[in-house]
Amino acid sequence: MSGGGAGDPRDDPDETKSEVIDCSYQNHTKAIFRKGRHRGSTFRRAILDEADLTEGDFSECDFRRASMVEADLMKSAFDGADFRGADLRKARCNLSNFRNCKLKGADLRGIRGKYAIWQGSDWWNAILNEDLEKAIAKKWPRPSDHSDSS
C-alpha cells in the first residue's frame, strides 16, 4: 500500500517515486502507510483511526473530514495539507511538519504535537486543548493582523 523502502522519503527530493492514491470515503483503520510517499493524495472522509503514517511524505494531501483518531503521524511531512474538519483526537504528531496546513474545524484535542512544526498553519481555527494551544502559540504565534470570522 505504501513505499515502505529503506530510505527516508523526506530526505529524497525525487518526486517521481511518489505514489498518488485515492482513499476517499474508505475505511483504513489500523492501516500501515509507514514511510509512504503519497504527496498530493486524497484521504477525504477516510477512516484512518489508529493508522500508521509515520516517517512519510503526505504533503499537499486532502484529509478533509477524515477520522484519524489515535493515528500515528510522527516524523512525517504534511506541508500544505488540508485537515479542515478532520478528527485527529489523541493522534501522535510530534516531530512532524504541518507547515501551511488548513486546520479550520479540525479536532486536535489530546494530540501529542508540542514538538511539531506548525509554521503558517491556522492552528487557532482548530479545536485544541488549552495546554497545547499555549505551547503552539508560544512557538508559532497567531498573526496580529488576523481577523477572526467567527
Regions picked out by a protein language model, each given a short descriptive name:
Residues M1-S150:
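Tandem repeat scaffolds
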